[in-house]
Amino acid sequence: VADLFDNIVAWLLDRALSDESIESTVSELCSRLVEGGVPLARVSVGRTVLHPVIGLMDMAWDRETGKVETNALTRDIVRGMTEFNAPFGTMSRGETDRIFADLTDPADVARYPLFAELAEQGITAYFAAGRTYGHRQELFDTYGKSFRGGSVSFATKRFSGFSKTDLEGLERLIPPFCVCLRIADDRFVATGLMG
């Protein structure tokens, strides 16, 4: 019997081949998870882009608004990020492929400035993971020097944090979600360059 996460994996793989925007995919992914009982408060997505001007794209979904906000960082800005002390920065440098934090634990909160901000907002647990697309490549001199890929983080305000089942399921979503990201990135570059 397929569970919530099996169904979402299948949906993500179908979605990767559709013409839907990555923003609508993120929005619907979050809705499906919340409707399935996963206590999401916030989801953040970051990815490098092989584009002549844009270096990084990020998106953030917030449960209170239900909206997905998208931002693009130019390559010049990315090159200036010499000390990017954040979970996505740690993963992009290849120091780890996943990060979990109990944001009710002061030791975990102290790991990154972002964790202190999230804890102030009532976030109790944070999980992030990502994937590299193909071989590591020299893209930037500083930030994620040899990283081309995508990362996603999930955060909750539930008092007890994420359950073991939540975390195992969210981890299963990372590869198919990163397939969606890569296809969206390729589409973004092709549209920008070819019109």
Can you describe what each PLM-predicted range is?
Residues 38-41, 52, 108-112, 184:
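Regulatory and interdomain segments flanking nucleotide-handling catalytic cores
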Residues 44-51, 104-108, 130-135:
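Short, glycine/charge-rich beta-strand/loop segments that flank catalytic centers
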Residues 6-14, 19-34, 111-116, 167:
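Short amphipathic alpha-helical segments
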Residues 18-67:
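Helix-loop-beta substructure at the N-terminus of cytosolic sensory domains
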Residues 183-195:
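Signal-transducing coiled-coil/dimerization helices and immediately adjacent hinge/linker segments
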Residues 151, 171-182:
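Allosteric cytosolic regulatory segments
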Residues 65-129:
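Regulatory sensory and allosteric helical modules in signal-transduction proteins
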Residues 130-171:
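Regulatory loop-to-helix N-cap segments in sensory/regulatory domains
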